[in-house]
Amino acid sequence: MTFARHNPVLTLAAVAVVAFTAAFAALTLANRSSSPPAGPPAVANGTAPARSTDARIRQLQAEVHAAPKEAGGWALLGDAYLQKVRETGDASFYTRADGVLKRALALSPNNVDALVGAGTLALARHDFATGLRYGEAARRAAPSLVRPLGVIVDAQVELGRYREAARTLNRMVALKPNLASYARVSYFRELHGDLGGALQAMRYAVSAGGGTPENVGYVQTLLGNLELALGHTAAARLAYGQALAGVPRYVPASVGLARVEAGERNYGPAIRRLRAAVGRLPLPEYVVALGETEHAAGRTAAARRDLALVGAEERLLQANGVNTDVDLALFEANHGEPARGVALARRALAAAPSVRSADALGWSLTRAGNPAAGLRWAKRALRLGSADPAFLYHAGMTARAAGRTALGKRRLRRALARNPRFSPLYAPRARAALR
């Protein structure tokens, strides 16, 4: 198999654009003890019973109190705090993780768990260069372990170092073809426009299973996202339902179901589901999804009220060390001050020259009234062959605004062909632009 079937440098020996890179790094932490399957698994293994993260935190806190000079205990506590962020969206746990991981590294600078944890934390905060440094340090400390490779490949992808990421993925899958490695293969293929291959790899990830129910629910949700991107709404519903069966009230899966409902113009249930999701996990991307769905439903005043919350949520993340430049740039381009979006996107691109940063800059420039400059960055955003309808929509509207009408129409048609319901707000605008 290959990571990207049309690129000869991306070969894979054994085997969604995901907005939060740390999710993959956390999968590496959570799957540290899973044994690799003999080949692509045929049947889902389900999830083993697991203690709650709160219980794990309490136990580890007691252990480090009893043995404060043991670096391993502090590293595991940092791991548990990072898992808590995944489950609650409470970014203050990043600050707690930072403190205990620094203590672990002060006690033992070459402790692999602490180095991987510190790299995961850096990725969660979108400090990809620092994440890469910690990942490389962990690999030097333990060359035969797979866990450092997850941190390294996530950082390489976000830094736009895709050829290096392909080589790292080859090694990771060869060492341990498990949930964490299959999920990364899926994302890498998705970035290169190979949604069929991405779907196949994500099915392997789900089948491989893992010891943490939330992690299994997460990859089941990613599987649903890929099915939805391919227009397979029934399969998407099934995947989201399986995630919710394993992790009741799991917010990412609930948001996925809301996206299905919004795509079917079933706005009432979608809005209710999104509002409940935001109440439990008020991440900016969920608030934006709620506001845009309300816009599509004609509830303009409610949309304005909800979108006004995004800035507050972003500030909370920033207060806990999270760099939100790309996400905030797109928000400003769509709903705020596009000129500020340009500044944020330029800063994001300087720190991490990925296709995501290029897309954010191209769209921000277009929305700020400079589509000619935006066109160049839209082309860079598509350079891997992405089939992401959002990228294609941005590129199509940019080309149209720059006077490249035929090019714009081709890109908009590609976006709608990939998924005619990719957004309750922007898919109708794409269709209107083609009329």
Q: Where does each model-flagged region fall?
A:
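TPR alpha-solenoid repeat register
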Residues: 73, 114, 148, 181-182, ...
